[in-house]
């Protein structure tokens, strides 16, 4: 049985998460739990072309992630869809 990955946030992602309303914050945390449990499942996240990052969708928000070995999921960016891909 595979253990879920440890989820770590960089400073800007943590700040973005805390700035969101409570229901959206909960939905994002739930999605991160699902990604940590099975990060390569296409229902949870998908690879971004030209990078080593993955993206997860929660409503109008996108979460950019990086799977770090051996058991860490780094949350890089949490932003609205219209803004997030400009920062890659």
Locate the predicted segments by residue.
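Enriched for short, Lys/Arg-rich terminal
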Residues: 1-7, 15, 19, 25-26, ...
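Residue-level signal for threonine
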Residues: 10
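A short, surface-exposed loop/turn module that caps and links secondary-structure elements
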Residues: 33-56
């Amino acid at each position: 049985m595979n253990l879920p990955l440890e989820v770590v946030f960089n400073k800007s992602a943590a700040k973005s998460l805390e700035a969101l309303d409570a229901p959206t914050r909960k939905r994002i945390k739930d999605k991160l739990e699902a990604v940590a449990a099975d990060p390569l499942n296409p229902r949870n996240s998908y690879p971004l072309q030209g990078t080593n990052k993955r993206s997860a969708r929660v409503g109008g928000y996108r979460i950019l992630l990086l799977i770090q070995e051996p058991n860490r999921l780094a949350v890089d960016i949490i932003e609205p869809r219209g803004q997030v891909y400009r920062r890659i």
